[in-house]
Amino acid sequence: SSAEGIMRKLVDEAGLEDAFEIDSAGILSYHQGELPDSRMRAHAARRGYNLVHRSRPVRTDDFFNFDLIIGMDDRNIDDLKDRAPSPNEYPKIRRMTDYCTQFTHADHVPDPYYGGADGFEHVLDLLEDASAGLLATCLAQDS
């Protein structure tokens, strides 16, 4: 949901909120209904993001309702493919870091929850970069 909050802000700032449907979901349902980690919310708030989305699990309908399904790492990608209703949906499944234009060496968004403040800042840096690249890619494909 950090990625959702960042992407939503970028889309809103571009005046494109009516052109995009942005949502986030988790692979596991044990955080269902919870807000993002309070440390992530605090770090994000300092950058102007309001992370208020409550967690929900990925649903089969997501593969029909969204043009892209984005995972944060290879394990997410594998889990998403396992949940896809058919291999026909695989092309919708992408890795978030594939959209990075500054952190081009990054191959995943790490889990910051067991480290210190630097981990949260690094994840936000990656997500800002990838979200900007994702928005640019979507706009280029739409033109």
Each PLM stretch: what is its role?
Residues L68, D74-S143:
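Phosphate-binding/catalytic loops
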Residues S29-E34, D62, M72, P85, ...:
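Acidic pyrophosphate-coordinating catalytic loop
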Residues S1-F66, A136-S143:
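Conserved active-site segments centered on acidic
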